[in-house]
């Protein structure tokens, strides 16, 4: 038990502070915006302080643990704790949410509700990453869906209600399987039901039952990640949502699925994971190729970026299913890396839409001369997306490759085949990424429009751009900055596979 309730404060602060937005004076939207940004900044600084001064990097066990008995009837605890696996996603959540609130500056309609929902989503995400009780994890997982649904249905494009309904149907459908898995694991085996992660990690199940539990969790995480064929909500949702919501979806929401896959499926159900991992490897490989081939056919700019997200998530799935130190560390690095890159691409797609009011790539062209700063930013992040050496995506994909090649679980022939198919996927990525830049920025299509309409990016947008670009280059040059957080925890997780 920690001496002070740091994690409870970090989880509860955003939603509590967000509920006070209703009490702010009605003096336009500026007060609400600054209040929300200050709360996000304070939360990020508090989280960073706690991790710098109260977290020991060389200890793979759970730290800063908090445990309050919440409901006596069935041993339900408010149980929080962090380790090397959850630090990266929590800091990423704070960083991207802070930037997304400053990206939401142009939102004027119902801005109080909009900013409250962003803060509520922040609490749900941090709660999911830091919960050490399976039912609390489920509650936080669900808490985060309600703000997303409202953000999608109230702010966005013409088809926003359709895409929001599709999102909630998919994710709520997946959550049913998650709840069944949570209750099944909690009620199995012991006289008293227990939902504590530590107790469940030492619990053994009959193989058939473990496979059923694993499959239930896998469906929930496959919807969220997304893993094909449960990915079809993602392009629609991204195509219609406001770009600050897209930043949160691409930067954090998709990473919750991958985090759950490691935290629950790998840690608590190791035997089932070693049975399922070859199939996950195949699905991940197909996903990279499928998304890379589907992306060039998308006319909508944001849908094309969404398919690139699906392709990048394929690398994470392959890293998780390689069951090696390098593979899993690479997957965690890719989670952080794509969190930055995905958020940045959606932010730039949104800012360019604000200026030219065009969604479809075949209507665009010639923006580079009119808006050189946006062109420079977009080109930089396109390079990061296609894993240019010196940027975080390259290191993550390289480490995942290393994980597959060194994996003792797979035969040499299957490793060569998977690596070959992944390499094809990496060759296809520049094709859709660079063709997107070409269609947007080159040509003469927009030259006959009066140029007075177009304003290049201002200081706020350049600041957000630099805030995302610096970590991408920093991690690309010195990946140990992220890997040092997770390396001990990864060894602990994998010890179940080789000694269990």
Curated annotation (Swiss-Prot):
Biological process, per Gene Ontology: ATP synthesis coupled electron transport; electron transport coupled proton transport
InterPro entries from the UniProt entry: NADH_Q_OxRdtase_chain4, NADH_Q_OxRdtase_chainM/4, NADH_UbQ_OxRdtase, ND/Mrp_TM
Enzymatic reactions: a plastoquinone + NADH + (n+1) H(+)(in) = a plastoquinol + NAD(+) + n H(+)(out); a plastoquinone + NADPH + (n+1) H(+)(in) = a plastoquinol + NADP(+) + n H(+)(out)
Enzyme class: translocase
Species this chain originates from: Nymphaea alba
Main localization, broad class: plastid
Enzyme Commission code: 7.1.1.-
Gene label: ndhD
GO cellular component: chloroplast thylakoid membrane
Xref: Pfam families: Proton_antipo_M
The family this protein is said to belong to: Belongs to the complex I subunit 4 family.
NCBIfam families for this protein: NDH_I_M
The protein, known as: NAD(P)H-quinone oxidoreductase chain 4, chloroplastic
Any GO molecular function: ubiquinone binding
Membrane topology type: Multi-pass membrane protein
Subcellular localization, as worded in the UniProt entry: Plastid, Chloroplast thylakoid membrane
Keywords: Chloroplast, Membrane, NAD, NADP, Plastid, Plastoquinone, Quinone, Thylakoid, Translocase, Transmembrane, Transmembrane helix
Highest classification ranks of the organism: Eukaryota, Viridiplantae, Streptophyta, Embryophyta, Tracheophyta
Positions of transmembrane segments: 4-24, 35-55, 80-100, 113-130, 134-154, 167-187, 208-228, 242-262, 274-294, 305-325, 330-350, 364-384, 386-406, 416-436, 462-482
């Amino acid at each position: 038990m920690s001496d002070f309730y740091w994690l409870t404060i970090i989880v509860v602060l955003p939603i509590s502070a967000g509920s006070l937005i209703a009490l702010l004076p009605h003096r336009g939207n500026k007060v609400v915006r600054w209040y929300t940004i200050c709360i996000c900044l304070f939360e990020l600084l508090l989280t960073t302080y706690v991790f710098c001064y109260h977290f020991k990097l060389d200890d793979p066990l759970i730290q800063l643990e908090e445990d309050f008995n919440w409901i006596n009837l069935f041993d339900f605890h408010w149980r929080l704790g962090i380790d090397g696996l959850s630090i990266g996603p929590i800091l990423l959540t704070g960083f991207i949410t802070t930037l997304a609130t400053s990206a939401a500056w142009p939102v004027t309609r119902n801005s109080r509700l909009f900013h409250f929902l962003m803060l509520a989503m922040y609490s749900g995400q941090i709660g999911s990453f830091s919960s050490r009780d399976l039912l609390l994890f489920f509650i936080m997982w669900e808490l985060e869906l309600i703000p997303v649904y409202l953000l999608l249905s109230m702010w966005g494009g013409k088809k926003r209600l359709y895409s929001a309904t599709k999102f909630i149907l998919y994710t709520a459908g997946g959550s049913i399987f998650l709840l069944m898995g949570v209750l099944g694991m909690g009620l199995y085996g012991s006289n008293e039901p227990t939902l504590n992660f530590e107790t469940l990690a030492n619990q053994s199940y009959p193989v058939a039952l473990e496979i059923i539990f694993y499959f239930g969790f896998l469906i929930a995480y496959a919807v969220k990640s997304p893993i094909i064929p449960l990915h079809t909500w993602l392009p629609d949702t991204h195509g219609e949502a406001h770009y600050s919501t897209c930043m949160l979806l691409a930067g954090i929401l998709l990473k919750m699925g991958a985090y759950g896959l490691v935290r629950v499926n790998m840690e608590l159900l190791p035997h089932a994971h070693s049975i399922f991992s070859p199939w996950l490897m195949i699905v991940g490989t197909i996903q990279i190729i499928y998304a890379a081939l589907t992306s060039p056919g998308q006319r909508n700019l944001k849908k094309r970026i969404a398919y690139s997200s699906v392709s990048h998530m394929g690398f994470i799935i392959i890293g998780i299913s390689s069951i090696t130190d390098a593979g899993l560390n690479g997957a965690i690095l890719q989670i952080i890396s794509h969190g930055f890159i995905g958020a940045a691409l959606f932010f730039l797609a949104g800012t360019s839409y604000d200026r030219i009011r065009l969604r479809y790539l075949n209507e665009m062209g010639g923006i580079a001369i009119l808006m050189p700063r946006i062109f420079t930013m977009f080109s930089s992040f396109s390079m990061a997306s296609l894993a240019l050496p010196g940027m975080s995506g390259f290191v993550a994909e390289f480490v995942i490759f290393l994980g597959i090649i060194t994996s003792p679980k797979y035969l040499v022939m299957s490793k060569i085949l998977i690596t070959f198919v992944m390499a094809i996927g990496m060759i296809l990525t520049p094709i859709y990424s660079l063709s997107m830049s070409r269609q947007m920025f080159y040509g003469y299509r927009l030259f006959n429009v009066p140029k007075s309409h177009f304003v290049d990016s201002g200081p706020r947008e350049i600041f957000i751009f630099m805030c995302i670009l610096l970590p991408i280059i920093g991690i690309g040059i010195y990946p140990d900055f992220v890997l040092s957080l997770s390396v001990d925890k990864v060894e602990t997780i994998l010890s179940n596979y080789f000694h269990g």
